[in-house]
Amino acid sequence: MAEAHWTFLTNHGHVLLCLARAPDRRIRELAEDVGITERAVQRILRDLTDGGYLSVEKEGRRNHYVVRDEAPLRHPVEARHTVGELLGALRA
């Protein structure tokens, strides 16, 4: 089988999963974890925050991210499921 260059989750999903596992990760660490630039992580964090999937709490000079488990998934195919259900399946 040829090596695939795609994944089942988007970079948004990867960042969300990383923050669910470690809510105090720094942007640099998230970029390394996901394999994208820090700038891309910043855009994703803004998308997730603006979309209501993530909130940010300042703790001194650091950010603490809170994933909104009750938020519905965006695509019509999965809209009856929540972020928490997706993360729960991936943690299992």
Descriptions of predicted regions:
Residues 22-26:
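Short capping segments at the starts of secondary-structure elements
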Residues 45-46:
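Short, hydrophobic-biased segments on the C-terminal half of alpha helices
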Residues 17-21:
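Short, locally clustered residues in the helix-turn-helix/winged-helix DNA-binding domain
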Residues 1-14:
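Short alpha-helical segments that sit at the start of domains
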Residues 58-64:
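Short, Lys/Arg-rich nucleic-acid/phosphate-binding segment
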Residues 39:
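Key DNA-contact positions within bacterial/archaeal DNA-binding proteins
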Residues 72-92:
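Amphipathic alpha-helical dimerization/coiled-coil segments
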Residues 29-32, 49-50:
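Alpha-helical residues within the helix-turn-helix
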